[in-house]
Amino acid sequence: MRKKIDVILTLCEPYRNYGYSFRFDVSGDLDKDVNRILVLLSDALLEDFKSRAQGLTQKDDDKAVVYATGMRNGMTAQQRLDRHCSRLRYILEGWIAISFVLGWNKQQTKAKIMRYLNNPFGIPEWADALFDSRYMATILAEGDLNRRTGLMNSILASMSLVGEGVINDTYCYEAIRKMAEAGVERYGVRRGSDFPCNACDEVCLHTYPITQIVVPVHPRCVCQTFPVYSDD
């Protein structure tokens, strides 16, 4: 991610004179290049997550990973990463506009970005920019487009959560597949922690056919599965 952010900052250098008016779309070529770089970032993250997930499988096929990166609550892992990269785009655009107005050089801007990437709106100069109507960067002119959407402020944490979900889904898929190969027809779920979670508690109340996968209940779910036999 550092290298791709560095490339974006370099591409933006010729547009310093735009100052308050800076947006990625001040140039069609710049806009396309930034989008291309962020697509590459999203693809690279997904490949990394898939590679790590593949290490959890005992099979030569990739069914578990295909399942884990597939549709969940209306979005695939790729779509979730694309969404977070789109969020990163707007945040970078705002930071770069601020850096041009305040006269930061590229290294100062990069240092600020990396320092505050876990809390992108924690940069002290951000609050001042939000109340300055001269800025044209989308996120500064219109506010956070993801406010009240349930998404975390931290782009890094959001992307990491996608990876956790892929790995957790793969692990659970493999656990249930092993039971199926052993002839188990139904399984149950038990809590793997005492952290309060009504959704996990509800899932643990029932047993399920081996063809139905109900775990993980959420990306950081640590619930465990166990075989259920007819005489249990």
Feature locations, PLM:
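N-terminal leader/targeting and assembly helices and adjacent pre-domain segments
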Residues: 1-153, 229-232
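Acidic, glycine-rich two-metal-ion catalytic cores of nucleic acid-processing enzymes
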Residues: 139-232
